[in-house]
Amino acid sequence: MGTTNNTIDGSDQVAQLARSLAAVGELIKKIRPDQWSAPTPCPDWTVRRLVEHLVGMNRVFTALLADEPPPRRNADHTDDDPVGAYRDSAATLQAAFERPGVLERTYRGPLGAATGAERLQIRLYDLLAHGWDLALATGQPVELPDDVAERSLEFVRRQLTEDARPGRFGPAQLVADDAPAIERLVAFLGRPVDG
């Protein structure tokens, strides 16, 4: 990983995570029963599978920060209560990032070594992008923290090389320079943004 933008202190970064987790949690709470099997902008993922991914990634990052093995990939992380599973995984992740020294420490992971602050930024951009996916798939307004999306966009622009895109991200899509930060973020990550 490269260096992080240190213009924001750790407590602000952790507060940004709390706001983002809460915003996505609100989207999940408003999913209607008939929407769980609906398609999403993520190929081959239903709304339920997308929420399983969000819960699973919260648990992966929590395990990584505790130097524990991550949960099984592609497992059903939600059981019969996706809303509760997300809420619990978000609270556990938030608590993990609030521990003293977590942001400064370097952690090993499947994509190499990175500081806790860098791990937090990785979690944020994935969380926000999938929050956008979820809002679109369920017809909800996209009400995600714009300042956090802007910071996430700055981070991925510095970190995501073109050779890292295949299999993970599509090519960057065109979007207006004055579009909301969340739209510029998801377009950079390969999602077409209409409008």
Question: In which residue ranges do the predicted regions lie?
Answer:
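Structured surface interface patches that mediate subunit assembly and partner/cofactor docking
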Residues: 2-23, 30-43, 60-195
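Short, surface-exposed helix/turn micro-motifs that flank interaction/cofactor sites
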Residues: 51-52, 131
